[in-house]
A protein has these predicted regions:
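Short acidic-hydrophobic, aromatic-tinged amphipathic segments that line or gate anion-handling sites
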Residues: 151-152, 258-264
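Small-residue-centered hinge/linker elements
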Residues: 1-233, 238-242, 246, 272-307
Length: 307
């Protein structure tokens, strides 16, 4: 019985290992292969943030895998995203941009700022940018505020709460475990705060000062950009954030932060109002950022191979 149980365990482990390897290679394969996409004559570039936007590609082949769900997280570099928006500005096949920041992708505030500047430049080419979402997070709304029109689902919501920063301190835990952290930080280096969580129980005045400057900088860039795009006084935006006055869709509309409350199936009428042309079946053709980047890369490859 012992050897039978041991054999069953070994066989079961081998099968599980084999299946795990097959699944893992399948995920990697899906990340590295993409179906060719042909952009039609009247397409709308859809920025839905289903891809992670990253500064530069990672050399780690598993960096784009979400091991919690065992699914691929497709990535687009900031360079390719900016190149796509710049190309779309003068691409006669692209009618405009549908901004839909709900895809679950990851992007830093620095990346959002550069994307927003690229979208502002895109608008100067005379093409429309329409934003829609069921709910707007603060970063998503900051990006969406560059659009000609912003729409929100009637039962949706919005976050406009300001920027904050929190730190976790370990000194209390170390004291209970009788652990003494050996810290080397010269007295003159009081702003070198990375080691503070290991020997302090709260933020030092110096660190609080620099963190306050950092979050104020983030907030000022965001709020000033929204104020300019939406025609809302900066003091009003600060008041709305301080008082948490915007969370429901109707509140966002009342304060002028969105232009209307619509369900997504009503967006076709909005596109038509901005001169967009549908396909022969009456449906609009959308091409995602990842698909458009793949098309541009394929075009460059064809040009290089023909030379």
């Amino acid at each position: 019985m012992f050897f039978a149980g041991l054999l069953a365990f070994v066989v079961g482990s081998a099968v599980m290992l084999f299946l795990s390897v097959v699944i893992l290679f399948g995920i990697v394969g899906s990340m590295t292969s993409s179906e060719p996409v042909t952009v039609g004559e009247h397409a709308i570039l859809k920025l839905d943030f289903s891809e992670d936007l990253i500064e530069s590609p990672s050399s780690d082949p598993f960096a784009g895998i979400d091991f919690a769900t065992m699914t691929a997280r497709h990535q687009v570099t900031l360079y390719n995203a900016l190149r796509a928006i710049e190309t779309a500005k003068n691409d006669p096949r692209i009618q405009g941009i549908y901004l839909r920041p709900n895809g679950g992708g990851v992007a830093t505030y620095a990346i959002l700022e550069e994307l927003r500047e690229a979208l502002q430049d895109f608008r100067q080419g005379g093409k429309f940018i329409i934003a829609y979402n069921e709910t707007y997070g603060q970063g998503g709304y900051y990006l969406a505020s560059v659009a000609d029109k912003i729409y929100l689902e009637p039962h949706g919501g919005m976050q406009w709460t300001g920027v904050s920063s929190t730190l976790m301190f370990y000194k209390g835990l170390f004291d209970k475990l009788d652990i003494q952290a050996e810290i080397f930080r010269p007295t003159a280096c009081r702003y070198k705060s990375a080691v503070e969580p290991y020997f302090l129980s709260k933020m030092s005045n110096a660190n609080r000062e620099q963190m306050q400057l950092l979050v104020d900088s983030y907030w000022n860039v965001m709020a000033e950009a929204v104020a300019e795009s939406r025609g809302i006084e900066l003091s009003t935006l600060n008041r709305l954030a301080d008082g948490l006055e915007v969370s429901l869709a109707q509140e966002a509309l009342d304060h002028g932060m969105v232009d209307g409350l619509l369900f997504e199936d009503q967006m076709d009428d909005v596109f038509r109002e901005h001169g967009a042309v549908a396909k022969s079946d009456g449906q609009f053709e959308f091409v995602t950022l990842g698909q458009y980047v793949s098309q541009l890369n394929a075009d460059l490859k064809n040009i290089s191979s023909s030379q």
